[in-house]
């Protein structure tokens, strides 16, 4: 779910951003609202912090509605984005969970801990970092350090 606007560094990368590996059904008002605002913020943060690790995806459930007549494509109820600034001093991370619905809040209001995204997805982010650093990065939600320059 890498935005095409972030893949302009090569023709191949841009083309690959439109493949099924990078696509997931999103409601229009999410994709043009809070989610789009978050993607724009991530671009700003990348300029500020030089390097970001961004992990984005759907939060899957056992039962999900589908779209399509011949090929049934599952429609997730939520999406997540985890952002890690490894070279910021101190390094920092933030996560977001947004419903696949009309998101009527500011993107900052969807901030959650990385631990919460791990609980919802079953993923273990930053597992190669020392345990103390992992706990520091994953346990809290410090939206102010991200949204205020």
Regions found by a protein language model. Name each.
Residues 1-149:
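Domain-level detector of nuclease and nuclease-like folds
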């Amino acid at each position: 779910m890498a935005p095409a606007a972030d893949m302009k560094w090569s023709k191949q990368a841009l083309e690959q951003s439109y493949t099924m590996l990078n696509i997931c059904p999103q409601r229009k008002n999410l994709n043009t609202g809070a989610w789009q605002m978050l993607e724009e913020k991530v671009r700003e943060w990348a300029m500020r912090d030089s390097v970001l690790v961004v992990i984005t995806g759907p939060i899957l459930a056992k039962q999900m509605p589908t779209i399509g007549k011949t090929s049934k494509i599952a429609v997730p109820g939520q999406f997540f984005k985890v952002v890690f600034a490894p070279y910021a001093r101190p390094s920092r991370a933030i996560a977001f969970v947004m419903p696949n619905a009309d998101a009527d809040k500011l993107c900052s209001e969807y901030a959650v801990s990385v631990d919460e995204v791990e609980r919802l997805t079953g993923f273990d982010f930053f597992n190669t970092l020392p345990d103390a650093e992992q706990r520091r990065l994953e346990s809290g939600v410090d939206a102010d350090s991200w949204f205020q320059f």
